[in-house]
């Protein structure tokens, strides 16, 4: 481990969360999933929960023993809806983490909100048609949906008086019996339509019915269903990306994506979950304001590399497409990098060494390395690294 190889093969870790699909990630990794176990996420990074394995000439090591990366790189296959989430700013995370430590709340407690001192901005890049909730609807759209749903007549008037914060605070703090009284008649109308296949993914009713089937138990309606109507429903086409900054409520609904985020576990949930919801903490950090979703098309910085820039200093995503038998592509890693090979076969040349990375495999490149990539088959890769402004800091 003393001599730098420059570039290493790494092996990530699969997370078998219940919401994951059963086919996409196993096929990508070349694994047989005869038991149809959910393969939700494939993690690449040094996160202490599931660090990647670093494969070296002298043996295999935990990547976390070699480097503490500021980012975590993932492949996601979303088959069932994820919880509504909000992440704190970096400053808020540091304060709240210290507070919960002083209160001696165990890190593994289900009531622990802040697992570390970091923020958790996220970038999702669609590998398929990808659906998500992202921020509150613009005012005219939210008013229109509150008018269109008969059960929300009282919420329409409340929103006119109290605005976004008042509306969200009302439904998140509402007694469960009142939640059931409002939502159950709505669900009684729309769930049969969903089961008949007459609803469509661009409709709020589609996702509300799906959420009810997934999350409602013992006659209790999940209050996150309100947010399906309040938030923007966003469809990403393959190749489009979207950025989730601190405070923006969001939930992944369906599809496959690459996800790149700051290395943090700080999540405040707002429904569509059986896990702990701390409404008081959620309301501290959620941005209750209209948001026009901004899809990121990326920008080509060379004939082969497309970069997706965000305000986050922790990471930057690049997509690389290599033509079969094409010219070598040269890079200098001024920060740590992880490459994931989505398709084809790619050869890395660094420090007079060669590493071949096949479909579903990944490589770690150390900072300060000059290296080139070449593909005989044609390949498509994604690189997790640092933005130009923070490289080398």
Predicted features by range, described:
Residues 301-304, 316-334:
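Conserved short histidine dyad/triad with adjacent acidic residue
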Residues 256-307:
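C-terminal, non-catalytic macromolecule-binding modules
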């Amino acid at each position: 481990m003393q001599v730098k190889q420059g570039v290493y093969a790494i092996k990530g870790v699969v997370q078998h969360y219940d919401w994951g699909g059963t086919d996409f990630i196993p096929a990508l990794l070349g694994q047989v999933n005869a038991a149809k176990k959910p393969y939700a996420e494939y993690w690449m990074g040094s996160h202490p929960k599931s660090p990647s394995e670093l494969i070296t000439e002298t043996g295999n090591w935990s990547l976390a023993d070699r480097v503490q990366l500021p980012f975590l790189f993932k492949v996601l296959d979303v088959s069932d809806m994820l919880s509504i989430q909000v992440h704190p700013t970096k400053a808020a995370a540091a304060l709240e983490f210290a507070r919960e430590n002083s209160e001696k709340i165990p890190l593994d407690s289900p009531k622990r909100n802040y697992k570390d001192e970091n923020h958790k901005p996220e970038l999702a890049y669609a590998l398929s048609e990808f659906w998500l909730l992202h921020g509150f609807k613009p005012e005219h759209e939210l008013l229109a949906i509150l008018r269109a749903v008969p059960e929300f007549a009282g919420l329409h008037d409340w929103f006119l008086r109290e605005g976004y914060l008042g509306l969200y605070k009302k439904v998140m703090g509402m007694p469960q019996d009142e939640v059931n009284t409002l939502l159950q008649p709505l669900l009684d109308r729309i769930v049969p339509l969903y089961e008949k296949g007459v609803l469509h993914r661009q409709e709020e009713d589609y996702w509300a019915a799906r959420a009810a089937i997934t999350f409602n138990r013992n006659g209790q309606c999940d209050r996150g269903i309100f947010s399906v109507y309040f938030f923007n429903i966003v469809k990403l086409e393959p190749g489009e990306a979207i950025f989730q900054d601190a405070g923006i409520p969001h939930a992944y609904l369906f599809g496959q994506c690459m996800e790149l985020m700051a290395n943090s576990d700080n999540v405040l949930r707002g429904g569509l979950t059986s896990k702990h919801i701390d409404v008081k903490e959620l309301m501290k950090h959620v941005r209750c304001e209209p948001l026009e979703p901004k899809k990121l098309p990326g920008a080509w910085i060379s004939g082969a590399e497309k970069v997706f820039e965000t305000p986050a200093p922790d990471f930057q995503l690049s997509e690389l497409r290599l033509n079969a038998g094409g010219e070598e592509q040269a890079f200098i890693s001024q920060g740590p990098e992880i490459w994931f090979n989505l398709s084809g076969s790619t050869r890395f040349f660094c420090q007079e060494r060669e590493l071949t990375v096949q479909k579903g495999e990944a490589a770690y490149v150390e900072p300060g390395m000059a290296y080139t990539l070449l593909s005989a088959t044609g390949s498509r890769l994604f690189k997790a690294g640092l933005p130009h402004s923070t490289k080398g800091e």
